[in-house]
Amino acid sequence: MKKKIAEYEVGEQVDIFLLIKTATKGIASNGKPFLTVILQDPSGDIEAKLWDVSPEVEKQYVAETIVKVAGDILNYKGRIQLRVKQIRVANENEVTDISDFVEKAPVKKEDMVEKITQYIFEMRNPNIQRLTRHLLNKHQTEFLDYPAATKNHHEFVSGLAYHVVSMLDLAKAISNLYPSLDKDLLYAGVILHDLGKVIELSGPISTTYTLEGNLLGHISIMVNEIGKAADELQIDAEEVLILQHIVLSHHGKAEWGSPKPPLVKEAEILHYIDNLDAKMNMMDRALGRTKPGEYTERVFALDNRSFYKPSFHN
């Protein structure tokens, strides 16, 4: 079986089919245009540059295009890149299914649905349970397909649901340690906190921001969705406001995207759980591509650090 892109090491030659995840135009110091493309397959993605591109080439190499690439792997300032020597658009008789080139969550959708449903079933507050079930049912198809982000963490098919399942397990463990926490609020907050991303983001493949995503963002979108759900279900209770606050504050600070800091205990804990799971996902994926005794490539969202994989971690 042919190697996947994440399995190649620095210095190795590459001759492989990949999917263009994103393509961004830039202008080089010599004034000539170039493209920065992110290329992917199920193992992950890699950055490459296409230099001195013409308008015709720009139109060819766009997101969701499958290409045949030849080149070599290099380490440029701590980042792994693919230096392109040859590239062309793949023929239809060579590859046809884009889904063969995208990274997916390591857990089946039906298993994630079963687990999340169990957490909702455990809720004892009827207002919180009804609101959570209503909103998840409304957006379930997209929720199970979408990534949790365009980059940095859980940026793969079904990444949003996978992120939520991991966070629910963390929430349960923390609630068992600190029984004063309201499990219903915390579980609902975990399930709903990023659900607005099914409106903020364009879809599971070559994900970009929608108009609503750019102008409103997933936090504002979800606060409005909770309000609409409460009206439809005729729920006029403080739980609605608290759930809206938990969603509104889950980024922690204004400079991180939350209009209000957490002012409810469960909101504070949700912020930490969200942050922990996102960072663990970034570290695990970077370390998964690294040999024992070596450092990862720089992880931009983690202060551009390179993490060491101990030599005894085989």
Swiss-Prot record:
- Which positions fall inside the HD domain? 163-279
**Which top class of enzyme applies to this chain?**
hydrolase
Q: Which CDD domains match?
A: HDc, YhaM_OBF_like
SMART domains in the record: HDc (SM00471)
One example of a Gene Ontology biological process annotation: rRNA 3'-end processing
Question: Any idea which GO molecular function terms this record carries?
Answer: 3'-5'-RNA exonuclease activity; nucleic acid binding
Which keywords, in A-to-Z order, does the entry hold? Exonuclease, Hydrolase, Nuclease
Does the UniProt entry include the keyword Nuclease?
Answer: yes
Q: Does the keyword rRNA-binding apply?
A: no
Listed EC numbers: 3.1.-.-
User: What family, per the record?
Assistant: Belongs to the YhaM family.
Function, as annotated, reads: Shows a 3'-5' exoribonuclease activity.
Record-linked NCBIfam families: PRK13480.1 (NF010007)
HAMAP family tied to this protein: 3_5_Exoribonuc_YhaM (MF_01427)
Q: What is this protein called?
A: 3'-5' exoribonuclease YhaM
The protein's organism comes out as: Bacillus cereus (strain AH187)
- Gene for this protein? yhaM
